[in-house]
Amino acid sequence: MAKKSMKNRELKRQLTVAKFAKKRAELKATIVNLNASPEERFAAVVALQKQPRDASASRLRNRCRLTGRPHGVYRKFGLGRNMLRQAAMRGDVPGLVKASW
């Protein structure tokens, strides 16, 4: 299991990303807009750089919902490989069956 502090840090990052998502999208649109003046585009770049580092969605890490494990997480289920296997063996995941050939 991941430490509580790591889980909380990731949760805090998710909240920060959600808080700044709209403003970041506006600034990025201004930066790519070729019709905007160079001063406006530069101001948008500066404003984007002044935002918190954790406001970027690329800082998020997929973690297992049950254990907080950072690696081996299946996006479709939101579970780590170990927890997914246990859930499948219990029959908690509909449609998922153990491979046999």
Curated annotation (Swiss-Prot):
Entry's Gene Ontology cellular component terms: cytoplasm; small ribosomal subunit
Alphabetically ordered keywords of this record: Ribonucleoprotein, Ribosomal protein, RNA-binding, rRNA-binding
Annotated InterPro entries: Ribosomal_uS14 (IPR001209), Ribosomal_uS14_bac/plastid (IPR023036)
One Pfam family here: Ribosomal_S14
GO MF terms, alphabetically ordered: rRNA binding; structural constituent of ribosome
Cross-referenced Gene3D superfamilies: 1.10.287.1480
GO BP terms: translation
PANTHER family associated with the record: 30S RIBOSOMAL PROTEIN S14, SMALL RIBOSOMAL SUBUNIT PROTEIN US14M
HAMAP family: Ribosomal_uS14_1
Function: Binds 16S rRNA, required for the assembly of 30S particles and may also be responsible for determining the conformation of the 16S rRNA at the A site.
Family, similarity comment: Belongs to the universal ribosomal protein uS14 family.
NCBIfam families named among the record's database cross-references: PRK08881.1
Subunit structure and binding partners: Part of the 30S ribosomal subunit. Contacts proteins S3 and S10.
Annotated protein name in UniProt: Small ribosomal subunit protein uS14
Name of the gene: rpsN
